[in-house]
Structures are given as C-alpha cells and as structure tokens.
C-alpha cells in the first residue's frame, strides 16, 4: 500500500485549529454537515446516472447509513453516492475549495468567542468533525472507478492519503474517533434525535444501524420537503431545511413555498435570510438556489435560475417541464427556465412590496442587509425597473427616515415634478451639504443615496412613473421656482445673471481653467458657494469613482455657483462696484472651500493653508 503524507493548506490549518479548540455550544451541527455532504454526493451521482446508467449498476437505491461503535468510541457515516478518488480527497479535504469557507477565514478576529460564533454563521462542512473527534478517517471509491483510497488526519496540520486494498463498494465512509469529552454523542437516542431534528427533510433515506442486531432503522421521512403540502410542514421543519441548505444558524426572514400550475409547472421553496450573507458581494459568489427536475438534483452552479440581484435567496426550485437528461449547457438559454425565473422574480418582488408596507421596521433591516444587491438590478437591461424601484427605500433628508419613492412623490409640493437626490458616502455629511440647503429650506425633500451602485442606476433610470430623477448637484436647480412655470424661471434666471455679471466675471477671471463657468446660484440659501455640474455632465461622485478605478484620467472642471445673499459674496460684490478688486485670496479660498465640501481635491494645498492663515491673522489683528 502506497501512502503520502501532506500538509494542510494554511487556510485549512486555521479552520482545524478553531475546530479542535472550539467552544461553540452547538457542536451537534457536525452531524447535519456530514449528512448534508452525503446527500449531495448521492444527488450528484443520481444526476450523472441519467446519462450513464453504468455508474449505479447493481446499486441504484441511494442511502445514508449512520452507525455507532461504542466499544471503539466511533461514529460512522456511510453513503453510496459519487465517492472520491485520490485527487478529490486532496482537493475537497486538504484545501479550501469553497468561497464561503474563505470568507469564514477573512472574518476571524482572534477573539475566541467571536470566532466560535462564526462556526454557526458559515458552516464549515467536513471540518466540523474535529469539534467532536480527535481523529477522522475517510474511505472512498469513486463511481465508475475501481481504486479505493483512504484519508486520515488528527487535524493537527497533516493528513495521509493512501491506496487501499480492501473490498469497498462505491461511495464514502467517514469514521469519527470521538473525543473523551464528547462521548455523549455515542448515545443512540441522542444521535437519532439529532439526525431527525436536522435532516428529516433530506430526500435520501437515512438509516441507523443498530450495533447489536445490525438492523437498519430509517430515521427520516426521505421525502423532499418542498413536495409536501404546506399544511403538513411545521415552522421548525422549514427552519431546519433552511439552515441545512444555507449553512447558517439564523432563521429565515421570509419563507416562500409555492406550487405553480398551468403552462409551466414547478415548485419553489425559497428563503430570504434574516442576516446578511458574508459572500453577498464576493467576486466568486454563487447563487444558492438548487435546481431539481422531478425531484432529481441537477445543479446550483452556472444556471440562470434567479437574477443576480436576488442572489441572497436560498432554496430549491423543482421543475416538471424540463427533461431529466438535459445538459447543463442547454440550461444556459432555456425558455422554460427563463419563464420560471420571471415567475419567481415577480413572486419575490411582490412579497417584498407586501413586507415593505406591512412591516416597515423589519423591512428596513432587510434593506440594510440586501438593498445594495437589489439595486444592481436597476442597471440590468432585462429588469422591470419600475417594479424593482417600487421595493427600494432611501433615507429622506427632510424626515431622516427610510421612505420609498412612491412615498416621496405622495409628499410632492404643489407643482413639483422632480425627484431630487444627493449621493455620497455618509448620510450625515450629505445632510449638511450646501447642495440641498435651499431645497430643504423650502420643505422639498431630497433622497440620500449612499451605495456606490446608486451612481450607476440613476444613469439608466432618469425617471420614475413620469417624474424626472435629478441630482441636487445640477446647475439648473432653482428653489424659488421649483414648483412654478418654466418661463418664469428662465426670465428670473437671466435677470440674475445680468445683474451679477460683474461678480461672476471677476471670479472667472481669478479662477480661470479651475472652473468651467461661474453662475449665480438659485439653490443656496446660507453657504457662499458650491460646485455644480450641468445636466449633460457626469455627476460629481460618479466621476470621482471612475477616477479611483482608473477608468478616466482626471476630474473635469465644474461650475462654481455663488450665493449673492451670503455676507461674504455680498462684500466682494460691493467692493467690485466700488472698483475694489483686492479680494483674490478670498475668491480662491471660497473655491477651495467648495471643493472640500464636495470631496474634490484642492489644486494647491500649501497655498490654501497660507490663505487661511492670512485671513485668520487679519481677523485676530
């Protein structure tokens, strides 16, 4: 027999160290994890056997067997699923293969209490064995292959993979050598109770093999939970199914169990988590909804079963209209699958609308967790943007609470026909922005956008239900005529520009190419000045993001808007009328201040500091 001793990947070593020294109270989840893996192995082989029946020749009844050997203090879990060869054992048990597990590692803090809580939040599959076992052996033969391999480790940094000469049927057997402190798991009653509690929904039959009589007693109902009538399923059963499916300990916030009949027949059992999933924005994230066809597992990877923006969903979809022998490639652009996807999307958005109206506080928490992902759908061409915007909520600057756009519209001032927003990183900073002071002073609300995705979706959604969506940073906003006729606004605007031409020309002469234009502001009420952009220009925050991503080389010149009612601007204007043009430093300082408030870089920080010091000295002296 040849054998190889290998070191675990450093990442696996970290997980194993945590498992071995775990203080996590709910250690019984190891059984859920191992049975879930065994069930997946059976599902994979069932799928492959549709195109190659030889793989299950002589043993077509899938099952999982649990045994207890009290004398040797062992728990054995055996399945006749797809099995593993040498490469599979190394890949699956010696390295990090799941992005979720990689995220688990990123969130380790070094605080034992916090880190042990992460075990439940992530689920770490096979490695959870080491919470209760001081040694684990795995024996496996892959379907369609003859060689048998063993894997063995005490979890202390190394493992052994070896060829085996023993007679072994297809599948995998895991033997846990139970720690002295965890021998209560060897109790038959307790172990059977754990299996029934966590794994009753598993569609593969799970048997408990009595060590005395060698009789096999079935522990689970072995019927897919989603195929049962809702009236026969308890809330606890739904919760356990969700937890085993999502590798999570939180309860689902929403459970959607529906049977669709008619042109397209399918059943969905979907869950919206109550806690944020750690891989929601991970580049290698997967959509965690499994596709079944007539109760046969097909895939949960590379299928367009739900839109990307609903990737927080967990659950299963079981179709009656797809052929069992369909290839995964054919699923990519399948008409039936597209109709199922559309029906699920409509159902989920409908449920979210209902929750938003009936349970606003709970919905706010959901939005904090998953709103960023949902809004990605507003950037997709195939999305019904209006339906999606109906479930979006944003912070109201006027009322300092989360509201929908429909609520915003319901509170329009008489004659108002524009939805105003301001985007930035921090809602508190946005509230103090000069860009919105005039609107708020007139009791015109402004929606505060604080997610990066907001700057993208507003570029492809310029209106909602016939109302324009407009950034408060735009130059043509006139708070005095927000609700008046356009011709009145244009007349007054021209009058202001002519009246203050001496002032705007002076600022432009001093600032030169630093600004595109200097205008009299129709939205400022307190601040001396602010930066603004035209309706056709890129929004300030969007431009800054693209510069950070090196998509564009540098910032464009902005408009500078002046508030003629501000005492500082008024002084400069009066000086100009008296032919006094000695306010160059003050003009530069006003511009620098406007840049700072908008998060724009100052051209010369040294000169800015000197100007500020000079003005402070004059004020003191």
Swiss-Prot record:
Q: What does this protein do?
A: Molecular chaperone. Has ATPase activity.
Per the UniProt record, which residue ranges are transmembrane? none
PROSITE patterns listed in its UniProt record:
HSP90
Q: Which InterPro entries match?
A: HATPase_C_sf, Heat_shock_protein_90_CS, HSP90_C, Hsp90_fam, Hsp90_N, Ribosomal_Su5_D2-typ_SF
Residue ranges of the region described as A: 1-328
- Tell me the SMART domains matching this sequence: HATPase_c
The family annotation for this protein states:
Belongs to the heat shock protein 90 family.
Which named protein is this?
Chaperone protein HtpG
Give compartment(s). Answer: Cytoplasm
